[in-house]
């Protein structure tokens, strides 16, 4: 029989990675029980959830086995051996879903990616469909485990994750930084968001004590294998390609889908600038827009680097569409579309038609005159200010991009101002 296995919340800030644990489980299945079908899936969930470990990702994979009970036992053994169970914030969960049942979990998965779920909701679904499951400690991982099985990917990308040898876990990673930039130069945009040229950073290598050496994102298996062959690193213990919802904007809720805004959700909102950008201590930039929901504060925080310079050019009356997550009643910007620029006019003293110099005031209520030619004029001139900003899409650099946020290179839109 064919069964989807979903696993989540096995890691902590001190180590482990659910993708790595899933790979270990897949290897056990292949050795002892049956076979794994296709690539595993890495499904990123709501990025604003406060109790996430790092990227809030859950894993699922499809297997063909004779005995589900034996499958449950093997996965449980892997979790007990490798999950960070001694961390109070780690609460693993795993589910075992018949392949034909998986489609019924789509509504739950959609909510896990866009909304906020409680463990009771996961337990209700498990009870409704009599789903075999594993629940360690609080079992919060059951939410992600179900979502990883039920998510339907109309759009998807791939990620090749290379893992370190266990004896190297927690030590400094060894790699040739230049080789990653060379790889990107050669393969972009078939691979993407692996380096940040603007800020000279390799972004596909974590700085946590987890088993991951690097995770290269791309659009095809062929491109990922080429990338793997071209980068220079310490020896790789094992590797796996995951099908994922990275870079899809799957977390965004359109303004037409809701009647009110809530914290810990991500939105796409259109509005008109009502309060011009201002900086606060720390280099964060804020502005406000008027939307169908009322006034909404938006922010480009310091890690977005050059993107803040775009935001600083906004002016009152500009029409924009913002993309980002809401926390503390503020949209944390991931990208922005400048839909329409407001016309800005200034009044200046007229120019002398004879000599081309700017005229001076002739006195209160007496108009203007040229000091040299004595030419006179009655009124000031209204001049349109040339805006530095252009309509189109602007995005944060790769080093500040969230897993789910779709980079402009993957968007078929006009006026893309790509940070690479």
Curated annotation (Swiss-Prot):
Record bears the keyword tRNA processing: yes
Outcome, altering residue 141 to A: Loss of activity
Catalytic activity: cytidine(34) in tRNA(Ile2) + agmatine + ATP + H2O = 2-agmatinylcytidine(34) in tRNA(Ile2) + AMP + 2 phosphate + 2 H(+)
Compartment list: Cytoplasm
CDD domains recorded: RPA2_OBF_like (cd04482)
Spans traversing the lipid bilayer: none
Cross-referenced InterPro entries: NA-bd_OB_tRNA (IPR004365), TiaS (IPR053434), TiaS-like_TCKD (IPR053870), TiaS_FLD (IPR013696), tRNA_Ile2__agm2C_synt (IPR024913), Zn_ribbon_TiaS (IPR055394)
Keywords: ATP-binding, Cytoplasm, Ligase, Nucleotide-binding, tRNA processing
Disulphides: none
GO MF terms, alphabetically ordered: ATP binding; ligase activity, forming carbon-nitrogen bonds; nucleic acid binding
ATP-binding in keyword set: yes
Cellular component per GO, a single term: cytoplasm
DNA-binding region residue numbers: 268-329
GO BP terms in the entry: tRNA wobble cytosine modification
Reported impact of residue 163 to A: Decrease in activity
E.C. number: 6.3.4.22
Top EC category: ligase
Function: ATP-dependent agmatine transferase that catalyzes the formation of 2-agmatinylcytidine (agm2C) at the wobble position (C34) of tRNA(Ile2), converting the codon specificity from AUG to AUA.
PANTHER family named among the record's database cross-references: TRNA(ILE2) 2-AGMATINYLCYTIDINE SYNTHETASE TIAS
Family named by the database record: Belongs to the TiaS family.
Name by which UniProt lists this protein: tRNA(Ile2) 2-agmatinylcytidine synthetase TiaS
Organism of origin: Archaeoglobus fulgidus (strain ATCC 49558 / DSM 4304 / JCM 9628 / NBRC 100126 / VC-16)
């Amino acid at each position: 029989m064919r069964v989807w296995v979903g696993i989540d919340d096995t890691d902590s800030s001190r180590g482990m990675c659910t993708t790595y644990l899933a790979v270990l489980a897949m290897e056990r299945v292949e050795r002892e029980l049956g076979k794994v079908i296709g690539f595993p899936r890495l499904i990123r969930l709501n990025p604003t959830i406060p109790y996430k470990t790092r990227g809030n990702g859950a894993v699922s994979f499809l297997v063909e086995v004779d005995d589900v009970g034996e499958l449950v036992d093997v996965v449980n053994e892997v979790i007990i051996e490798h999950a960070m169970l001694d961390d109070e914030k780690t609460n693993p969960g795993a589910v075992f879903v018949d392949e034909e049942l998986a489609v019924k979990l789509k509504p739950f998965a959609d909510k896990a990616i866009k909304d906020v779920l409680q463990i009771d909701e996961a337990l209700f679904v498990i009870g409704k469909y009599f789903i075999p499951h594993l629940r360690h400690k609080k079992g919060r991982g059951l939410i992600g485990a179900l979502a990883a099985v039920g998510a339907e990917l109309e759009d998807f990308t791939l990620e090749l994750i290379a893992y370190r040898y266990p004896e190297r876990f927690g030590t400094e990673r060894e790699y040739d930084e230049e080789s990653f930039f060379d790889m990107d130069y050669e393969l972009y945009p078939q691979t993407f968001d692996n380096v940040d040229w603007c800020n000279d950073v390799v972004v596909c290598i974590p700085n946590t004590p987890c088993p991951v050496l690097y995770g290269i994102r791309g659009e095809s298996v062929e491109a990922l294998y080429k990338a793997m062959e071209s980068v220079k690193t310490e020896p790789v213990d094992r590797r796996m390609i995951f099908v994922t919802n990275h870079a899809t904007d799957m977390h965004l809720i359109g303004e037409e889908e809701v009647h009110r805004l809530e914290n810990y959700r991500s939105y796409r909102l259109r509005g008109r600038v009502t309060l011009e950008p201002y900086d606060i201590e720390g280099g964060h930039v804020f502005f406000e827009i008027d939307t169908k929901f009322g006034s909404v504060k938006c922010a480009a925080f310091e890690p977005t680097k050059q993107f803040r310079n775009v935001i600083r050019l906004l002016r009152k009356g500009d029409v924009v569409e913002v993309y980002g997550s809401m926390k503390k009643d503020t949209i944390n910007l991931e990208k922005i579309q400048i839909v329409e620029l407001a016309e800005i006019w200034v009044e200046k003293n007229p120019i002398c038609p004879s000599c081309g110099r700017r005229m001076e005031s002739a006195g209160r209520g007496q108009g203007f005159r040229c000091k040299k030619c004595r030419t006179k004029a009655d009124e000031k001139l209204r001049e349109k200010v040339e805006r530095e900003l252009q309509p189109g899409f602007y995005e944060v650099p790769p080093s500040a991009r969230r897993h789910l946020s779709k980079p402009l290179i993957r968007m078929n839109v006009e006026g893309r101002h790509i940070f690479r």
